[in-house]
Amino acid sequence: MITKEVTICGKQVTLAYCYATEIAFKNMCNEDMFDFTKHAIESIQAERDPDIEKTIYAIIASMMAYYEEKDKAPIKDTDLMKEAKPVEIGTAMLAILSMRAEFYHVPEGEPEEKQKGGKKGKNH
């Protein structure tokens, strides 16, 4: 499991990336995390906002992977949707993208196609 701390709604929140993150995201969105992150990276590179609804689901999935139960997280999903600042959402999304790359051992600048089916993370 890879973890990073971010500030959301004025609170320190630990996000995690592991297989549980991918499973939770798929259950919420019915989309593979690989496909979502690929589109998010393309949007960021084109200076467009990624799909905000799926971005929030990715953050919730990442919080659930760390805290195991939504009620244990320092913020609730409703806080995230209603009170989080755009910069906080963006920072959290960049943290998730970074953790995913680290989990799959993808060097910076590596083509996205190599991430799917790559080496398993060091802590799975």
Question: What are the roles of these predicted feature ranges?
Answer:
Residues I60-Y66:
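Helix-loop "lid/cap" segments that line or gate small-molecule binding pockets
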Residues A46, I59-I60:
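Conserved active-site "lid/cap" helical segment
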Residues K54-A58:
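Elongated alpha-helical scaffolds
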Residues A16-Y17:
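Short linear motifs in exposed loops
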